[in-house]
Amino acid sequence: MPPRNHSNWIKAPKIEYISSECYNNFEVFQQEQEHIFSKVWIPMCHISEMYDLGCFRTTQIAGTNVIAVNSNFGIKAYRDHNIHSPSGVLSAPPEQGTELHCEVKHGGMIWVTLDPNPTQSVDEWTAGAFDCIADAIDTEEMEVFHYH
């Protein structure tokens, strides 16, 4: 095969390929947010990060501010319009936000979905992906710790 020169490199290949535009096109990004990431279960944090009543964690899922709170009724998650940044500065009680579906599964991970009517539970959605490590992560309580 002869060496490739500039004109060879800029020609589109004569095969099927995925354009690199899908990685930096804002319209594709918005479609992914709306049709994929807002419909699936996302592991938000670990239960050990919010053992105490009133503890909370914030994040963004598909560009939406989300807060998980350890409440009197267990772990609850809310779409929160009162978070001013993902770092968690609250200006109103989280219960003022829209409640989201939330499950604690697979070693104590808190899973949240923005989908108001999820068709699958976390166990159904993960479809056995954690089976090979279930003995290790579900046998004893784990604790997340951070090096600061």
Which role fits each region the language model picked out?
Residues 1-76, 88-148:
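Rieske [2Fe-2S] iron-sulfur-binding subdomain
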